[in-house]
């Protein structure tokens, strides 16, 4: 008797499945097709994205080679092209390198590029600080001390990545401006920071020695 009931149950299930298929089968097929298309489209995008990244990497290395060979004009043009059309990560790297090449012939124009990068919040604070530091390094020999302070003092806070370099540049700018008080302030800050790199510490000690020699002369 139980076999009869089982056969009836199976027949009912088959009939239900048949009705469901007749009603919704076309939608199931469409969903499967869309899934296949979506997966295929994603795979195509991944392939295309990897291809573009590889091309940008090759172009970046070629531009670096031009710079190494002293072909600065060609390197500048290559970095500018990549900064305009490369993948997002290489665009940023290329923009920094473009500014470095521009600085060889036109420091003012290079500062403008670095200022643009420093103002771009999409880069994140570390890269923004790096751009601001690079601009300050270009200007340290020519700009008034007050301008260097305005640019670099925010970078000297204990939580900033490039604080040691920023403090060093400010100490140098103060020395050039013959502002002994400011130079001592930044020098003391550098020497008191236990995380100051030994190279930076040595440079400041040399700067202090030069300042002492200036006093005696």
Task: Mark where each language-model region is.
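Short, low-structural-confidence N-terminal segments
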Residues: 26, 32, 36-46, 216
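Soluble extracytoplasmic domains of inner/organellar membrane proteins
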Residues: 89-217
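Flexible helix-coil transition and linker loops at the boundaries of alpha-helical arrays
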Residues: 47-48, 83-85, 119-122
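Amphipathic alpha-helices of TPR/Sel1-like and other helical repeat/solenoid scaffolds
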Residues: 16, 74-82, 114-117, 151-152
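Short extracytoplasmic
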Residues: 58-93
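N-terminal positive-inside, membrane-proximal cytosolic segments immediately preceding the first
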Residues: 1-34, 55
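Transmembrane signal-anchor/signal-peptide helices with a preference for the extracytoplasmic
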Residues: 38-60
